[in-house]
């Protein structure tokens, strides 16, 4: 029922946000429409979600048909499967919106968070299996010959043996994951603060202004969105290929399939480039240097050493470009590092994707902050005190 999960909503959000930049009418609606404009865009996103869910549900039906997973087939069976998948995806979208409106934090992020945590038992099981393989290899009971005699091909047997993990390998994986989480937490809170000075002005007998402040610019301004969207687009060819059927070994199609597989080097390079591109795209949407400079000018503020107006805009754009580049490279490295580890140890089930790690850490931090704010609003002590 929930096989499509929240993916149609994520894909529709990508499309609508790209169209918001490309279509002037949508851009005006997002910029000048206020709360009503946001509701209209949200409504358009819902309709787009249903449309994408229909396409993906049809794809899932044909995938099950190609792999002979259906005991019965026919127009009514197809209709029931497609409608059920669409209903499940729509329900997940509705549930996420309810959590956002009445709960704590972003509902869609929390659903993704829960889905990622649900995979941890499988990862732990893979670790145990990997250690058992390693022990059997050391004891001499698991060899290439024993696997080939059991019906494995030589390639399959070698791949099976390569997925073995030593206890020290598990320890290094856990330490690496903890260091990665600590790095994500550090970068998530890192920011560049631009000093702001406000000119003094006299109103009647009172003197106003003269104080100093800062303009904070987060290093990872766009959050996890570039990674989510880049992953959705980069994995689209493989998803489509899975729907129509994986090609047979030894064919040209199979070679192309392997070349763009999510474990291939080509996929990692394309994925990394897309993350950088989406990071710049979202930074330009969320932070407008011209608007910031105009607001500072209206409030009598200025950046020391730069005149109000175009010089201020150019300085903010320069700082924004540097921060965005650093944040984009950080996101790219964090996203592909677990993929590289999974490729090296030949055990993809152990490598929770960098996307997943960023989502888990980011959602956890945002939820803690949201709970802190809720408790402080009710005059209770902080959540961590």
In which residue ranges do the predicted regions lie?
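N-terminal cationic and glycine-rich segments that engage phosphates or anionic surfaces
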Residues: 1-385
């Amino acid at each position: 029922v929930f096989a499509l999960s929240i993916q149609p909503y994520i894909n529709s959000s990508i499309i609508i946000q790209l169209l918001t930049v490309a279509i002037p009418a949508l851009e005006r609606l997002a910029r000048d429409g206020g709360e009503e404009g946001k509701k209209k865009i949200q409504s358009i996103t819902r309709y787009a979600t249903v449309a994408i869910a229909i396409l993906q549900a049809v794809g899932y039906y044909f995938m099950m048909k190609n792999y002979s997973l259906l005991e019965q087939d026919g127009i009514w069976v197809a209709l029931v499967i497609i409608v059920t998948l669409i209903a499940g995806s729509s329900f997940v979208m509705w549930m996420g919106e309810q959590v956002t409106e009445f709960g704590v934090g972003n509902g869609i992020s929390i659903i993704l968070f829960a889905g990622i945590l649900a995979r941890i038992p499988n990862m732990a099981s893979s670790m145990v299996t990997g250690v058992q393989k390693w022990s059997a290899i050391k004891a001499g009971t698991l060899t290439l010959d024993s696997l080939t005699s059991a019906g494995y091909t030589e390639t399959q047997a070698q791949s099976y043996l390569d997925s073995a993990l030593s206890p020290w390998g598990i320890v290094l994986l856990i330490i690496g994951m903890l260091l990665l989480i600590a790095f994500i937490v550090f970068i998530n809170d890192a920011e560049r603060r631009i000093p702001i000075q406000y000119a003094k002005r006299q109103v009647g007998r009172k003197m106003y202004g003269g104080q100093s402040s800062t303009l904070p610019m987060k290093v990872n301004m766009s959050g996890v969105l570039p990674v989510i969207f880049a992953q959705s687009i980069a994995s689209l060819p493989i998803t489509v290929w899975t729907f129509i059927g994986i090609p047979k070994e030894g064919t040209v199609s199979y070679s192309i399939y392997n070349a763009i597989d999510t474990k291939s080097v080509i996929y990692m390079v394309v994925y990394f480039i897309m993350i950088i591109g989406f990071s710049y795209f979202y930074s330009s949407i969320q932070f407008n240097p011209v608007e910031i400079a105009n607001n500072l000018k209206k409030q009598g503020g200025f950046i020391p050493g730069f005149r109000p107006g175009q010089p201020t805009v150019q300085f903010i754009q320069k700082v924004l470009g540097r921060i965005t580049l650093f944040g984009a490279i950080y996101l790219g490295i964090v996203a592909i590092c677990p993929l590289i580890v999974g490729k090296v140890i030949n055990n993809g089930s152990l490598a929770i994707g960098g996307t997943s790690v960023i989502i888990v850490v980011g959602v956890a931090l945002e939820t803690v902050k949201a709970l802190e704010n809720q408790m402080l609003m009710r005059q209770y002590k902080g959540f961590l005190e």
